[in-house]
Amino acid sequence: MSEPINQQVAEIAHLITVRILSDSVSGSGVIIQHQNQTYTVLTNNHVVADNQDKTYQVLTADGRTHIAKWLRSTQFGKVDLALVQFTTSQSYRVAEIGNSNKLSVGDAVYAAGFPNWHWINSESIEKTRNWGLKAFKLTSGKVGMLPAQSLESGYQLGYTNDIAEGMSGGPVLDISGKLVGINGKSKYPLGGIDVFKLADGSLPSQAVFQKMEALSWAIPIGTFQQLVSYLKA
């Protein structure tokens, strides 16, 4: 059963979450920086990597769309993160960065993004690509697992929230509305245990895998902060 959503957190999530659109993909992202008239959005690498011309449309909370570009100069190795930027004179809220290292199993978390599909009923679904802001979704849940070692692609925050295709790259927020992770893996992914290969190349035990596949997974914001510090060094 999902937890009730704090209205303040819901408002923050709506303001900082964007939809990233290209000819081939649709995903989500979160605004993490504003400098002069340039906004930087953090998302998943798998949201942006398959687009050939590397330009995107970003849908912001006011319903406007902006031309954005993938910052290919900032690479995160195998970690499934990417940055895109857009320029505008409009003013948008920037996410406040939380401390993912202080999360504990059982803590409330909220996951936001723009699902690609909407189930009309058990037999019929509709694409949300042209829905605009109406497609936005915010789910509540709890931290379910914090393994000592991350997955090969940086995922290390398991949570009970339901996320859907298209919500990849969207924010995971703590109870104060601070950014603690980036959505990226939904529950019971295709590919089985191989999807959960650990950073050292090993696979989890069958018992651990069964717990992992029953959760959604995010990359902790602390992982991003460490990578950015390393790149700037």
List each model region and its residues.
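Protease-domain processing segments flanking chymotrypsin-fold serine proteases, especially trypsin-like
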Residues: M1-I32
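Catalytic-histidine neighborhood of serine endopeptidases
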Residues: S2, S26, Q33-V79, S89, ...
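C-terminal cap/linker of serine protease catalytic domains
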Residues: S2-A10, P115-W117, N121, N130-K134, ...
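Terminal peptide-recognition signature
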Residues: I16, I20, G29, Y39-T43, ...
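Short conserved beta-strand and strand-loop elements enriched in small hydrophobics
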Residues: V18-I20, K54-G63, V109-A112
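A structural micro-motif recognizing beta-strand termini
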Residues: L21-D23, N44-H46, V84-S91, I97-S100, ...
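Short, solvent-exposed secondary-structure boundary/capping segments
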Residues: K78-L83, L151-T160
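Flexible, gly/ser-rich surface segments that form the specificity/activation loops bordering the active-site cleft
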Residues: R93-Y155, I163-M167, N183-F196
